[in-house]
C-alpha cells in the first residue's frame, strides 16, 4: 500500500481487473463455478491449482476482500469468515492442539462458552478466571487475575470487549 494513501488504497490498491469491465468488485452469487474439465476441478480441490470450486470454500468476491485487508494491514495473507464464531473457531483450531489450555474471562458470549465446551473432547481445556458472579466481574478483568491462571499449557488468553456480566 506504500504507493497509495489509505482511502485510495481501499479503491485501487489491489489493481484487480474485473470481468466485463466492472469498475468495482462484482458480487458473485453463484454457489459453484464452471471448469474446462473434471481434471481441472480435481486439481483445484487438491490445491494443485488456484481457482474456485464452491462458494462456501472461496469465491472471487471474498478473495478480493481478503486481498484488500491484507494490503491495508500490510500483511502476508488474510482469511475472511462468515461470522465471528467462525473466525474464532478458525483461529482456535489453528493455534491449539490436545493438551493445550485457554485462560478465559467468565462473562463471555454464550456461543463462545459453547465453543469452548466443544473443544474439550479434543483434549483442550479452559480455565475461567473467576466465578461468574456480578461482584467478581470487575476483579476478573484485571490483568493480574489472568496472569495468575497462566501455565506452560496456556496457548490463548481470551476475553471479550463487551462481556456478559
Where are these regions (language model features)?
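Conserved N-terminal alpha-helix of the aminotransferase class I/II PLP-enzyme fold
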Residues: 32, 37-86, 111-119
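A glycine-rich helix N-cap at a beta->alpha junction
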Residues: 118-130
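Short helix-loop-beta connector
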Residues: 72-76, 96-99, 152
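Conserved PLP-anchoring active-site segment centered on the Schiff-base-forming lysine
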Residues: 94-110, 129-130
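Active-site phosphate-binding strand-loop segment of PLP-dependent enzymes
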Residues: 137-165
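Short acidic loop-to-helix transition motifs that present clustered carboxylates
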Residues: 85-88, 130-135, 141-143
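Short conserved active-site loop signatures built around small residues
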Residues: 1-28
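Buried hydrophobic positions in well-ordered alpha/beta secondary-structure cores of metabolic enzymes
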Residues: 21, 69, 87, 102, ...
Amino acid at each position: 500500500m506504500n504507493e497509495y494513501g489509505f482511502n485510495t488504497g481501499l479503491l485501487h490498491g489491489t489493481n484487480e481487473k474485473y470481468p466485463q469491465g466492472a469498475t468495482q468488485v462484482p458480487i458473485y452469487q453463484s454457489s459453484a463455478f464452471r471448469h474446462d474439465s473434471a481434471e481441472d476441478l480435481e486439481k483445484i480441490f487438491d490445491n494443485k491449482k488456484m481457482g474456485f470450486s464452491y462458494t462456501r470454500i472461496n469465491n472471487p468476491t471474498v478473495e478480493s476482500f481478503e486481498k484488500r485487508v491484507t494490503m491495508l494491514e500490510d500483511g502476508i495473507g488474510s482469511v475472511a469468515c462468515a461470522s465471528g464464531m467462525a473466525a474464532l473457531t478458525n483461529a482456535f483450531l489453528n493455534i491449539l492442539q490436545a493438551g493445550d489450555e485457554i485462560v478465559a474471562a467468565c462473562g463471555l458470549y454464550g456461543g463462545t462458552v459453547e465453543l469452548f465446551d466443544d473443544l474439550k473432547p479434543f483434549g483442550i481445556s479452559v480455565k475461567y478466571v473467576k466465578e461468574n458472579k456480578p461482584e467478581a466481574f470487575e476483579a476478573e478483568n484485571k490483568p493480574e487475575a489472568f496472569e495468575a491462571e497462566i501455565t506452560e499449557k496456556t496457548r490463548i488468553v481470551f476475553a471479550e470487549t463487551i462481556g456478559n456480566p
